[in-house]
Amino acid sequence: MSENNEEQHQQQQQQQPVAVETPSAVEAPASADPSSEQSVAVEGNSEQAEDNQGENDPSVVPANAITGGRETSDRVLYVGNLDKAITEDILKQYFQVGGPIANIKIMIDKNNKNVNYAFVEYHQSHDANIALQTLNGKQIENNIVKINWAFQSQQSSSDDTFNLFVGDLNVNVDDETLRNAFKDFPSYLSGHVMWDMQTGSSRGYGFVSFTSQDDAQNAMDSMQGQDLNGRPLRINWAAKRDNNNNNNYQQRRNYGNNNRGGFRQYNSNNNNNMNMGMNMNMNMNMNNSRGMPPSSMGMPIGAMPLPSQGQPQQSQTIGLPPQVNPQAVDHIIRSAPPRVTTAYIGNIPHFATEADLIPLFQNFGFILDFKHYPEKGCCFIKYDTHEQAAVCIVALANFPFQGRNLRTGWGKERSNFMPQQQQQGGQPLIMNDQQQPVMSEQQQQQQQQQQQQ
């Protein structure tokens, strides 16, 4: 895009809010600069075209963030085109012109390495408005900053809420449509679609929150696979379930019941004939999990053969991973191409077995393939969807497991691997906000060897 076109595009976008990332409820934009042409949604069009069946259907009108029920924050400002040398302390000095600041967060833009962006939250909307009018279009350090109101996500991050990830949304599903689909369930709290703020279009998934764990589970069971605007919903947990209440779910969803294999999909009363692998992630008896037969390595987990009758059951209780922030998941989702569905887990104790690992990884979705390298202390989990792998990466980053803290990142199937520069210095593959490595299995194994030397 030329400078003139970019300026014209910015003028058109000037009154269009962008996404907010704050400690309370956040939705990070696909790019730091609303005027930028680049976004993951655009880059991934070739991969997403086959899945988004509604996009090329002239009868389907895509939803838009502005008209789709999304509200704006009156206390949070988006600051774009920010000089990379600016720290949060420096930025705070500038934005105190409006009044006391509640929070500042500077983000790294993965689509534009030359600038950062930030979110500035005020205690009072009046103060935020003063800062917007005073600083928008002004030069801060070396760059002219672009300031706008931010979209306020309705997703609560409270520990008392239970969040569902809702995927495979049609392009014409907006916030209101998603809310209407779930609002009749008891203890429903909120629902919203995740938007690409470059185009204003849906990213094809959203989140729904409940104040009751039982109601969230019931909503997932009832709505799994149900048609919404022409596409079946795919629902998963976006956060942990309360460990204190696990026994209730174990009685209802014992994944080892009726002599079924520990990695077979459960038979839900509400979804008897649905082959929806995402349902299996939370439907296991943590105290009676069965191990994966060695002969079944490389097979889709949903097609595992029954274990032998003489196979002993594991008695170890496996803890659930911590609650994850839906917006952190969204950030990771956008850090790798949609075609990548493999998560890498490193720093695994060498004595850990498949029986120890599989129940943990099943928390996040339907596992198509699992490769464990105990001598390397790592494994690769190929999930059914890109989103499921992202949830795994976020939830298990630094997660304590048998005396070690796990390391996570994106993996990439060897058959699809394209040569890239060798990673430097054996740096640990740790999930963080600044970079998301996409490495082949061979590279990651070599990296593990370097760390062990």
UniProtKB/Swiss-Prot annotation:
Identify the residues that the record assigns to the RRM domain, covering every copy: 75-152, 162-240, 341-413
A GO biological-process term: translational termination
Keyword annotations from UniProtKB, A to Z: Acetylation, Cytoplasm, Methylation, Nucleus, Repeat, RNA-binding
Q: Which residues carry this modification: N-acetylserine?
A: S2
Q: Which region ranges are annotated with the description Disordered?
A: 1-67, 241-262, 419-453
Q: Where is this region: RNA-binding RGG-box?
A: 260-264
Alphabetical list of SUPFAM superfamilies matching this protein: RNA-binding domain, RBD
What segments bear the compositional bias annotation Low complexity? 244-262, 434-453
What InterPro entries is this protein classified in?
Nucleotide-bd_a/b_plait_sf, RBD_domain_sf, RRM_dom, RRM_dom_euk, SLIRP/GR-RBP-like
Q: Name one GO molecular function term.
A: mRNA binding
Entry's localization field: Cytoplasm; Nucleus; Cytoplasm, P-body; Cytoplasm, Stress granule
SMART domains, alphabetically?
Answer: RRM, RRM_1
Give yes or no: UniProt keyword GTP-binding: no
Where in the sequence is Omega-N-methylarginine found?
Answer: R260
Q: Name one GO cellular component term.
A: P-body
Q: Which Pfam families match?
A: RRM_1
Oligomeric and partner information: Interacts with NAB2.
* UniProt function note: May be associated with hnRNA within the nucleus and remains associated during nucleocytoplasmic mRNA transport, once the proteins are in the cytoplasm, disassembly of PUB1-RNA complexes may occur prior to PAB1 binding and formation of a translationally competent RNP complex. Binds to polyadenylated RNA; prefers to bind poly(rU); binds to T-rich single-stranded DNA.
Other comments?
Present with 49600 molecules/cell in log phase SD medium.
Write down the PANTHER family for this protein, in alphabetical order: HETEROGENEOUS NUCLEAR RIBONUCLEOPROTEIN 87F-RELATED
Its recorded name reads Nuclear and cytoplasmic polyadenylated RNA-binding protein PUB1
Organism field? Saccharomyces cerevisiae (strain ATCC 204508 / S288c)
Give the gene symbol: PUB1
